[in-house]
Amino acid sequence: MELKNKKILVVGLAKTGVAVARFLAKAGAFVTVTDMREEEALADVLAELSDLDITYELGRHVPYSFLMADLIVVSPGVPMDIKPLEMARSQKRRVVSEVELASWFIKAPMVAITGTNGKTTTTTLTGEIFKACGFETFVGGNIGNPLIELAESGQEVARVVVELSSFQLEGVESFRPDVAVLLNITEDHLDRYHSFQEYIDAKLRIFENQTADDFAVLNIDDPLVAACASKLKAQLFPMSRLHELEEGISYRDGFITFSHKGKVLRFGTEGFKLKGVHNLDNIMASLASTLLMRCDGDCAYEAVKSFKGLPHRMELVEEIDGVAYYEDSKGTNVGSVVKSLESFDSGITLIAGGKDKGGSYEPLAPLVESRVSHLVLIGEAKARMQQALGSLTDTHEAQTLEEAVEIARRLTKPGGVVLFSPACSSFDMFKNYEERAERFKAAVRAGKKGEA
């Protein structure tokens, strides 16, 4: 689509909206930005765009602007079913996401990665493998830099790796990755979607425009993911920790085996720095994606062995008096916490809770009963979590994260583990999951110094 002199409305002025507005203005479009927040709340953001010719409609959405736009670009934080967007679609206005817009201007081969959990680790590792194998690579999307920033820069890269949330996938039309990865599907964002199926359908849009020339990497150990296989137009490339595969990538007895069209590569996992059962899935997805896109096996293996993982994902903070403290603030849904609990056999003190996302906590029940010695609950969700899990183990409530850490310190015996994996978002008590993580680390370290 030619952007020059087109009337384009950008809905939402967070990080992605800023990047989109900047790109469109520089491309010569007539840009209007609308956001329900008032000007005072957006002062810093507006300063970033002050040198560009942009019209702002703040504190409200003006229906006329939605109806007159040649194109509407919606930021991921804005639900697609708000009334102005529904009205615009009913009048045949074109409504897309930032990822869709960016894809029109990016020609490099692309790996796109989605799933409820593990996206960021898999995306980062995939990018690291490409770079180690000599491919200049852009890594972005839901992690770090919006994809539109690559389009704006004009930088020529050999590979693109993009992490995609369900929100970003809602607004795709022609977006088509060469390799699309679906890691897993568990209940999440039910505070945004009307049903679990609606959330699943958003995830599956990653495959919508693929053809037989493309690959779909599916974790077939997840029944909801495996059920998608029959709907694919792309070539299925399965991954599994539970089954050996003649075609695909699988794990057995300490080795990952990649098999594709008669080519077989085996990778021993003993030297991997990235620990945890769930990370085997992330590693297999990263290896599959990069090896399918012409990375050298030895080079890819060395990159995996040197990868230490990311902050806020099962990060060992300290070992104090024989107790290991793990920070897993990115564990914002039940499925993620299940994976984290599976990494330990027993003796866990679990700190959980935060802003409730509307899903069921029942999938945690078997692991809480069998592996969690003490459960400490915080935040808005603690009443619901108490009801679902409180009778299964020794359970306590705390008013602050610092109090929760102190309770955990008192209860956990040497040789045990304190795991902070909330199963909830952070917005009831913190600005974001990063701030929540730093508060946990500070509380743990304060105890080490005898300050708590």
From Swiss-Prot:
Top EC class per UniProt? ligase
**Residues passing through the membrane, by range:** none
Task: Write out the GO biological process terms.
Answer: cell division; cell wall organization; peptidoglycan biosynthetic process; regulation of cell shape
Q: Which residues bind ATP?
A: 115-121
Enumerate the GO terms in the molecular function aspect. ATP binding; UDP-N-acetylmuramoylalanine-D-glutamate ligase activity
- According to its UniProt record, the EC number is 6.3.2.9
A Pfam family it matches: Mur_ligase_C
Pathway per the UniProt entry: Cell wall biogenesis; peptidoglycan biosynthesis
Entry's Gene Ontology cellular component terms: cytoplasm
Catalytic activity, reaction form: UDP-N-acetyl-alpha-D-muramoyl-L-alanine + D-glutamate + ATP = UDP-N-acetyl-alpha-D-muramoyl-L-alanyl-D-glutamate + ADP + phosphate + H(+)
Q: Which InterPro entries match?
A: Mur-like_cat_sf, Mur_ligase_C, Mur_ligase_C_dom_sf, Mur_ligase_cen, MurD
Where, subcellularly, is it found?
Answer: Cytoplasm
* Major place of residence: cytoplasm
SUPFAM superfamilies according to UniProt: MurCD N-terminal domain (SSF51984), MurD-like peptide ligases, catalytic domain (SSF53623), MurD-like peptide ligases, peptide-binding domain (SSF53244)
**Which keywords appear in this protein's UniProt record, sorted alphabetically?**
ATP-binding, Cell cycle, Cell division, Cell shape, Cell wall biogenesis/degradation, Cytoplasm, Ligase, Nucleotide-binding, Peptidoglycan synthesis
Would you say which domain of life the source belongs to?
Answer: Bacteria
Homology family: Belongs to the MurCDEF family.
Describe its function.
Cell wall formation. Catalyzes the addition of glutamate to the nucleotide precursor UDP-N-acetylmuramoyl-L-alanine (UMA).
In terms of PANTHER family, this protein maps to: UDP-N-ACETYLMURAMOYLALANINE--D-GLUTAMATE LIGASE
Identify this protein by name: UDP-N-acetylmuramoylalanine--D-glutamate ligase
Q: What is the lineage of its organism?
A: Bacteria, Pseudomonadati, Thermodesulfobacteriota, Desulfuromonadia, Geobacterales
